[in-house]
């Protein structure tokens, strides 16, 4: 590589790292998530801030680059963690999640290495959806991106959920 090409690569890398430190933001995906990595396995996600966060951040790998997004996550009373995804068949990130997909969840300033699996069991999906409805009753209205659902809201047919398990 010549000096000009090396400078271009270095500039692109620096730009991507700056972009990653700012996003994901609102609807724009980001790159690498930064924070302190939690090395201890999480058995009960109620012992984290999952249900206190308006939005969680998820980082997956899309080919050779990191791809991060904001989305709803919720811990069930049993301590399971799930991700919420409406109209998920059209979401870029969801199409890239395979069985036991390695990912990172950021809750506050903490990074949790996790595995993702799409949940298809109707009983588990209903349990996850109930946790979503309950969490959204207490979400800050000023920063809320999902409308507050009624407590008796039924699970939507277009709604997917992903089970999150600790991989450390």
Residue ranges and their predicted role:
Residues 1-22:
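Hydrophobic membrane-insertion alpha-helices, especially the h-region
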Residues 2-4, 52-55, 123, 167-168:
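Ribonuclease/tRNase effector modules and their secretory precursors
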Residues 4, 50, 70-74, 82, ...:
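Residue-level signal for well-ordered alpha-helical segments
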Residues 20-67:
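Short, conserved active-site entrance elements at the starts or edges of catalytic domains
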Residues 35-37, 51-53, 61, 82-85, ...:
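A short linear-motif detector with a strong N-terminal bias
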Residues 51-88, 113-115:
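Short beta-strand segments
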Residues 88-168:
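Short, structured beta-strand-loop surface elements
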């Amino acid at each position: 590589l010549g000096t000009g090409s090396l400078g271009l690569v270095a500039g692109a890398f620096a730009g991507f790292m700056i972009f990653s430190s700012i996003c994901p933001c609102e609807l724009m995906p980001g790159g690498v998530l930064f924070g302190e990595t939690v090395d201890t396995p999480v058995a009960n996600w109620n012992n984290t801030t999952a249900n206190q966060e308006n939005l969680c951040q998820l980082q997956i790998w899309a080919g050779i680059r990191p791809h991060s997004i904001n989305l709803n996550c919720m811990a069930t009373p049993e301590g399971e963690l799930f991700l919420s995804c409406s109209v998920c068949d059209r979401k870029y990130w969801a199409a890239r999640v395979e069985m036991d997909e390695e990912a990172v969840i950021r809750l506050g300033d903490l990074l949790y290495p996790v595995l993702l699996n799409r949940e298809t069991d109707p009983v588990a999906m209903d349990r996850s959806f109930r946790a979503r409805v309950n969490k959204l009753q207490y979400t800050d209205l000023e920063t809320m991106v999902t409308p507050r659902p009624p407590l008796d809201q039924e699970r939507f047919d277009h709604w997917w959920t992903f089970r999150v398990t600790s991989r450390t």
